Amino acid sequence: MNINGPVNVYLAGEAVKSEVVPFGEITISLEDSKLLEEFKKDYDELVIKCIKTDFTVPGVDINLYDEINISYREKWDVKMLKFKNKELRRIIFDTIGALNDLTQYLTDEYMRVLETPHGLELIARNQSWEQGCKLREVLRPQTTKLRYKLRDLYRELHPEEYEGMPPFDDYPEGEE
């Protein structure tokens, strides 16, 4: 047999497909799924901790700022860019953004260190009329909004756990 010109070769068997994984109502690539599991391993406990923390009462973890900042700075500032699915990327960006937004309220402007029998903790600054106003008008409403946002994002990160459940309908005053 004499063959002149290009030759097409077909292999018998299944065509190579990129694997997809269900994620709520969408599907994501296997690579995104693995990256998501790594993200959840690094961030789930931290997100839950932030959701449960009332930043206006004594006992805020003095290490919370570092826990948020270090995980982002040392790993996820670049790694979060690797998510290919737009919806998943939005959830990841919004989660990291909300956590990073919380860190501004863990600074000297809003908090002071309190020595307790349990060690050092943070407490909201409230030693003057101005600081009390800032606590009521800025710290409480802003951290509450961020905590609700993180709660909703956590639910989006774990669609399998909330399947069939109605959406949350409790939001901070004036929000929805």
Segment roles from a protein language model:
Residues V21-E176:
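Long, low-complexity or tandemly repetitive, helically biased scaffold regions used
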